[in-house]
């Protein structure tokens, strides 16, 4: 089992579901440099022509990713927008940008569940440019029940072969 799977299994033992799980997951992901650099390598393989796209990052995860990989991200993408966090728990997205250099956006985030964060951000981006869209969302953890179109994840909770569940041995 890889390191990411082990760490997620450990969190699931303590927090099997809900906001406590996502809070613990978020804290673990943004504090692990190895997982963040693995994520960037994973994401690079999922994005076609990043130099023509705007990268959307959110909250503490976005800040952590920029701190570790910012130079590389600035070289890869036409533009980068960092949006406030807390959208999953009800905060409205705040975008400090008046012009999108490209309306074709890609979103990197730590986790995905229902798509609420992505959809709220896309609505705000459309206020800046009516043709704005988030074509692909690349995440570390995908907890959505059904596979979502245009969501790529390193770890999918509801996968057909959940090998990581072997580590959920409760003592």
Give the residues covered by each predicted segment.
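Short, glycine/charge-rich flexible loops or terminal/linker lids adjacent to PRPP-binding catalytic cores
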Residues: 66-109, 114-122
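Structural motif
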Residues: 54, 104-106, 136
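Glycine-rich phosphate-binding loop signature in dinucleotide/nucleotide-binding domains
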Residues: 47-51, 100-101, 129
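PRPP-dependent phosphoribosyltransferase catalytic core
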Residues: 3-11, 123-171
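Short glycine-rich phosphate-binding loop at a beta-alpha junction
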Residues: 51-61
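Conserved beta-strand scaffold positions in the cores of enzyme catalytic domains, especially
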Residues: 55, 77-84, 137, 151
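Active-site-facing substrate-recognition patch
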Residues: 1-51
């Amino acid at each position: 089992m890889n390191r990411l799977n082990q760490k997620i299994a450990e969190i699931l033992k303590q927090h099997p579901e809900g906001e406590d799980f996502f809070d613990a997951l978020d804290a673990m992901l943004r504090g692990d440099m190895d997982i963040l650099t693995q994520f960037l390598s994973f994401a690079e393989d999922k994005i076609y022509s990043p130099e023509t796209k705007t990268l959307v990052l959110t909250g503490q995860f976005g800040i952590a990713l920029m701190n570790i990989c910012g130079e590389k991200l600035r070289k890869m993408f036409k533009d980068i927008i960092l949006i406030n966090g807390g959208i999953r728990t009800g905060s409205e997205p705040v975008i400090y940008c008046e012009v999108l250099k490209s309306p074709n956006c890609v979103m990197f985030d730590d986790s995905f569940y229902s798509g609420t964060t992505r959809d709220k951000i896309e609505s705000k981006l459309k206020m800046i440019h009516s043709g704005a869209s988030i074509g692909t969302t690349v995440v570390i953890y995908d907890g959505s029940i059904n596979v979502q179109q245009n969501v790529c994840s390193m770890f999918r909770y509801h996968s057909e072969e959940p090998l990581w569940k072997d580590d959920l041995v409760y003592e």
